[in-house]
Amino acid sequence: MSENVQKSENKTNGQPEPESRPSRRGLFASVGAGAVAAALVNPGKIFAASTPPIPSIRIPKEITDTLAEATHVGDFSEKGGITGAEVFAKSCKDEDLAALFCCPGNYQIINAISAAGIPAFGGRSEGSMTSAADGFSRCTGEVTACSGTEGPGFTNMIMNIAVAHRARTPLLVLASNVTIATDDREYFIQTGYQQPTTEGLKKYGKRLIAPDRVHEYAAYAFRNLKTGVPGPVHLDFPGEIYRARFTEASQLKEYYGKEKYRTESRPHPAPKDLAQAVDMINRAERPVIVAGHGVFFRKAWEPLMVAAEKNDIAVVTSGPMRGHFPDEHRLSASLSPDAFMSADLVVFVGQYSMPTKQEWRFNPEAKAIRVNPTAEDLGRNWPLDLGIVSDEAAFLEGLASDLPQKKRDAWVGELASARQKYEKRLLDEYEQGVKHSQATNTLHQAVICKEVHDFLYKGSIDPKQTVTGWGGWTIGNCGARWLRAYRPGQEVNCPYQYSAVGPDLAMMIGAGAAVQLGVGPQAPYKGAPVLVLTSDAGITYSMFELDTAAKYKIPIVCVVFNNNAWGMWPSAVGTPRSMHMYLFQENLRYDKMAEGLGARGEYVRTQDEFRRALKTSYEVAAKERVSTLINVQALKEFTSGKDYPPGNIINPEPSVGALAH
């Protein structure tokens, strides 16, 4: 036996190495010293030929197959009867629940709702899915549902339930809750009662404990969701409820249709109240209507238009959605905040989140009328000369009928002049932003927002087509000034009132789902892409829902203002050992993260690059239903008026940029 073979045997437990396997000495000799050195630096490279290729991202066949399956609504006559979950799903179907957004958990309920044919979307985080449901409702006015499992899934939804509560969204919050039999035992993930957790964040809530009352409590839910001032309703389902079986309707209590458990009747203004309102408006020289949430939810934009045009009344839209009075209209005051101090009469219609006089720019001496569907809130925060309990549509229909024809040329001229001044300020801000961008080789927020504005409203795209949303601090405040709403449900104010960081992308994926389905006011633009402006701080919370957008082919263009910091970084200036808490790593590649989730990614630093990226991203979204994240590199110092004037400008309220009310 040769010396070489003997050494080989020693290394292989007495078995000679096959001739096809080179020795380490032979391998190194054959590849040469340089290759060996390279392998030590990058050991994977030398064996790359034997590494299988990384498979491409793809949508599982089961997704498209199951979405194409026939619907099934449970029936008492079926073998074994119908489950409590199917009873509840049938109630949701009868009530035209618009959509469900969820993560796995509460399995029997979400499965039954989806099987019944209600559009259902499964995502990556319960909190983000709650915001998606909220966004769907904000651009349609319809009731939507979200769902999560008990324990961690439910608690993950809390911030987003709070966001919906402040926006008065008709959101049906569903969650499983282990079993009644295991109450007080800390059984598995049942670590607390849900209803106390949502106290103060809902209009109504109930833990279901009687299986035969499941339909009755569905009625409670939809009665609250579809009458009065809307708000979240929270139901939690122990296992005894959704697993119960019924073979005939008589086994359920209070089992009858929606025409018997709630009414479509709405309060109308008392004749004397309507007459007084007409008289006050007719006597005023500069009246303005604040058209809030209720005008949108009650689909009252047509009588609003008739009343405004008939009597030359200025209109400013307010709330978590915009467009129920078009921004381009000569009577729109949404871009004329400098004119508000001239108003001598303010008519609040459907303004559910009332400001104080100090928060809004109206003349504190102006007279005030407020129209609300319930009486208990009238007079809160803003002293009234006339409070009217009425459905918003009924009141506006009354105005449209009873107001006389009247021209207010001076008032309309003042609105136009104020608008010109406002738009001039925007252009001045943009010109400063161009200089800052060119000096830093990054992109200022005003440049980003004007480019989006010009692309969506000044180019070849129908200006009414694209639903937009905005969030973040520096980019959100700027974006709100530049985005426009020319028809109902065209703009979603993501941070409205609660000012939460992070729901923006998820909320707009929900809005995108509504556009893809063509629900309500989105019907004429069914299939169009949506666009959202957000921040590097905000994208953290819902970026993984780009996977959800890809899975359901919801095309969204997401513009991320990457300024390497929380927007509140100036709060650390001058304080020792503080700034590090406000900063991120610089130049993070959110575009690369998006690519890893099945979306496109674009990274831009200049105005020309952004313009090209925006055009390409929108075209891909429209033609291929593929989403894109555009990572726009900026500087944190753009927030500072001292470093880069004008800095971050807080928008006047009410106006296109308002978010507090």
Q: What residue ranges belong to the model's regions?
A:
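N-terminal alpha/beta PP-like core and its mobile active-site loop of ThDP/TPP-dependent enzymes
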Residues: 4-5, 16-18, 32-40, 46-410, ...
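A glycine-rich phosphate-binding loop feature that marks nucleotide/adenosyl-phosphate handling sites
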Residues: 236-241, 473-475, 633-635
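Active-site diphosphate/adenylate-binding microenvironment
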Residues: 85, 106-107, 111-112, 421-522
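N-terminal acidic, proline/glycine-rich, low-complexity intrinsically disordered segments
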Residues: 1-11
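Phosphate/pyrophosphate-binding active-site segments
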Residues: 54-81, 212, 249, 260, ...
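Active-site metal-binding loops of divalent metal-dependent hydrolases
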Residues: 293-294, 351-352, 473, 535-537, ...
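Thiamine diphosphate
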Residues: 182-190, 331, 340, 379-381, ...
